[in-house]
Amino acid sequence: MKLTHQDFNLFNREIFTFKQLKEQQTSAEIDALKQTYKQHWEKWKALNLAITQGLPAELGITKPKIESWTNGWNLRSHFWAAYRSEQRQAENACLALLLNKKQFQVYLMFQHYKSEERAGSVVAYNQLLNRLEAWSQTIDCEGYYIWPQEEHELVDHLPLKDYL
């Protein structure tokens, strides 16, 4: 299963709210758009489930949390999924996958949403930055970036080699 230009182009639009879409498009056009979103999201879901099945069992990651293609009021401007092992379901840190109009990202993140219900502080999470230099010695840094999440997901991220 491969991501195609159409998967990225799905998000290349100005309007994501159903209220605004209804002002500019017919019901039939909106229904067609919803159907297209659902088709791409089903592919996204299948991709994430396939990734999970391909992971080593000792990681304990059996089911990703896959965000829906809509929240009821808006189409998503990206598709997103979080991965946590069974032992880490109650922790804020997770691996995540993001697909938007610009890129496909795999990243470690601190999930702020409902963070008060899970364990792990921002301070403890940020301590992981201290391990980046040693880890970077084991990989080719090309293609790795730092995303502080304070910047928008579409802003170019800082290359890891520049950060180090």
Regions found by a protein language model. Name each.
Residues 102-163:
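Compact, glycine/acidic-enriched structural inserts
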